[in-house]
Amino acid sequence: VTAPRTLTADLLVLGWGKGGKTLAASMASSGRRVVMVEQSSLMYGGTCINIGCVPTKTLVHAADERREGDDPQEYFDRAVTSRDALIGKLNDVNLHMLADHDTVTIVDGRARFVGPREVEVTPSAGGAGLSEHLLISAETVVVNTGAEPALPAVPGIDGPRIHTSTSLQHVEPFPRRLAVIGAGPIGLEFAAMFRSFGSEVTVIARGERILPAEDEDVAHAVRGVLEDEGITILTGTSVGRYVDGPDGVALQGADGGDGAPLVADAVLVATGRRPATADLGLEQAGIEVD
């Protein structure tokens, strides 16, 4: 068995989000040896640039510009193409923000702690970057892995028509009927966006009102705006199972009328986010988490 290659650095950053890339660039500018580990080259720059703020607002703007006569599928495809072109440019800018420093090493792969200041990096599934295991030790290690969608344990939630806020940005085909599970900011943003793109949208909230973290008068006003746009909102509703079929996915527990379950062409599950630390081996670094 071949021993893994080793690297040493002054600073090791796990994850290319805003805080990590800024710190890495600053340390590299002062001549420090920096290693940046990112599991996917598609995430150079972090969530905001690649799958969060910028791409979603690009799609929101495109949806707002759609005219009534525009074909939803064709218009959505053009909007996604424009989104991807912009994100590709920003991703490349962020790559060079670090790669152009002589003291920075960029590693594509998945990191896991093997000691307090040492990680093992393995090739990401399907990745084209790292081809062998790598051990990296550093004086300072920064965990900058961000968050990921928190999906509830509901039967059928791994079905082909079930999406997160990331995958729905490239959904194919365009959903004539979209169900949104969760009535927080992300779910409602996508609900309004896809309604503007031309989908029939139903929002399903487990609680008795939308935007539970906001003041009640704010939530009431937002609900009125969404319903005026033609969005159906079901509160006090929980989906117990997703059943995929030839006509779409049936959401058992959500009333679609006449006593039958609601059926959708695509489902967005927007039920919150959690720290993306499950596979980091934090216990090996002596890090305790709740």
Over which residues does each language-model region extend?
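Beta1/beta-strand and adjacent pyrophosphate-binding region of the FAD-binding site
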Residues: 3-17, 174-184
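Residue-level detector of alpha-helix initiation sites
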Residues: 17-22, 43, 48, 148-149, ...
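A Rossmann-like FAD-binding core segment of flavoenzymes
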Residues: 105-108, 112-128, 197-290
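N-terminal Rossmann-like FAD-binding beta1-loop-alpha1 element of flavoenzymes
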Residues: 9-36, 187-195
